[in-house]
Amino acid sequence: MERNLLSILMRRRLAERNRDAIELAAVQKMEVIGSTEGYTFDDGSDHDDVTKIFVGGGRQGIHYIEFEYVKNGQLESGVHLGVRYRGFTETFEINHLNNEHLESVEGYYDYGSGYIQGLQFKTNFRVSELIGYDEGTKFSLSVKGKRIIGFHGYMKERKIISLGGYFSWIHPRKMEAKGSKGGNQWDDGTNNDGVTKIHVRGGVEGIQYIKFDYVRKSGQHINGSIHGLSGSGFTQTFEIDHLNNEHLVCVEGYYDDESGVIQALQFKTNIKTSELLGYKKGKKFSLVDKRKKIVGFHGYADKNLNSLGAYFTTVSPTKSECYGSSKGIYWDDGVFDFIRTVYVSSNVMNVRYIKFHYYNRAVVVRQHGWNSIVEEDGEKEFELDYPNELITSVEGTMKSFSRSEIRISSLTFKTSKGRTSPTIGIASGTKFLLASKGCAVVGFYGRHDDRDLVAIGAYFSPLPPPTAEKLQAQGGNQGDSWDDGVFEGVRKLYVGQGKNCVAFLKVVYDSNTQVVIGEDHGNKTLFEVKEYELEYPSEYITAVDGCYNKVNGTEVEVITMLRIQTNKRTSIPVGCESNSSFVLKKEGYKIVGFHGKASNMINQLGVHVVPLTE
């Protein structure tokens, strides 16, 4: 009976995989929006991506459109639709070599004239200007999780009267499994929108099993399969709130070569970081791909988890509102990996130009506004600590000089390290803010005329989770090593004094709003144990200073004094000062964990730090 049940479960699982494979391979044709009373055109779906779009139009709407595609690295032209004549012509290029793809088309259709009036194209990196007019009924061609690979539609009297598209899944990138290939290979697949819950079972030998719950692209929730076997040990879970745009971006862990078993795992989302689940033993590894999220896992497992790999897909940036004038020349820098430097020139009236030094494997310079540097226009520079510092918001003002003339009058930049640039320009007029919670600026767009910057907006992408840095421990070399690990922050410390030394340390941490009580290090004595409670989360530890020395006429060095510094106050020292002093601190960082060595006293102390964010 058990064999029959197992056979049924295996057949069901195989059927699900086959169905997923068919869904992933299928091209979806979205029917046209607009009129069908004309001549049909169809570029087909036998393309990898759209690379360039030409659009022409006039007073009656869009009368010319042409698409360029790529197939197996070769460029292909679609059907020439309509006729180019007097009016406007715009070109929108898509950099498929940088993994940019077309995700949607929005437009306006006028039922009175029967013509498409305007079109706007959105990729996974940027959004085009509206080409044409926002008159009539708005429509959209888009399918969640898919990209456009072809177009079809109708035309009449040399004008475009309807448009439809062909869609294909955006295939996630497979990152090979870290660990050994012992045991049975497993693969959860890629037909998911995200990970919602992770179940980890650990034991003496390492991670026994892992299980992932997913949300499908259709919105259906899937309880994943167990990979490995359950034994005596601990089970921990980590939940991800996908309904509030939280997604998994990184997995770190440890793998033991000798046993061939994953020893520990830690999960990071765009919002929070889990505890280290398991033991810090063996080689460290990570599964991460910049500006992408994890949508599936694969690996090997038998009695324990032997290896783990992941599937990544792009997280599309969001585009803020553009503040300022709707007139002038439209510009759009798109999306970059980093912003290294911002230059702004202003006079007593307004901002003249803005210049960015972006970085995408090389420095890319973009300047918008007045192109000539004039002596009275002082250029101000704001340099970021690339790649560790990101712009998180831009405050500005815009000023009306007449009913139709609006200009940007000032700009101020804030960063992920809590720095604020000087205000560049004169802060007068209407205030505006470019910001998105939990995100960093990855590009700008806007408008300029022949003299000044008249409008500005920004692209935002989720901030990467802060990466902890382990600062070297200070003190003696005797005692047993210990490491509390990395947490969201510190809530409370207990520091106990011994005879001429610090004898005891215990730390209470915060992990995803949950209180985590650290282990005892050293021994309590008859002396008082001092308690330091922080006003968490507004208060955090910025530094620990102390002293160490040999005690009791021996060669054993121990910590003799500790003092805690926060962003709000400095504690009274515990212990006695001695000749050898130290400071555990990194500018612009906060302490989120402790490590060191201990016997019946605290012999050595070090810290884990992460960059300060807003």
Swiss-Prot record:
Species whose genome carries this gene: Arabidopsis thaliana (Mouse-ear cress)
Lineage, broadest ranks: Eukaryota, Viridiplantae, Streptophyta, Embryophyta, Tracheophyta
Pfam families: Jacalin
SUPFAM superfamilies registered for this protein in UniProt: Mannose-binding lectins (SSF51101)
Entry-linked PANTHER family: JACALIN-RELATED LECTIN 12-RELATED, JACALIN-RELATED LECTIN 3
Record keywords, A-Z: Lectin, Repeat
A GO molecular-function annotation: carbohydrate binding
Superkingdom of this protein's organism: Eukaryota
Matches recorded under InterPro entries: Jacalin-like_lectin_dom, Jacalin-like_lectin_dom_plant, Jacalin-like_lectin_dom_sf
SMART domains hit by this protein: Jacalin
Family that this chain belongs to: Belongs to the jacalin lectin family.
Protein name: Jacalin-related lectin 14
Listed transmembrane segments: none
Occurrences of domain Jacalin-type lectin (ranges): 27-169, 172-314, 317-462, 468-611
UniProt keyword Repeat present: yes
Keyword rRNA-binding in record: no
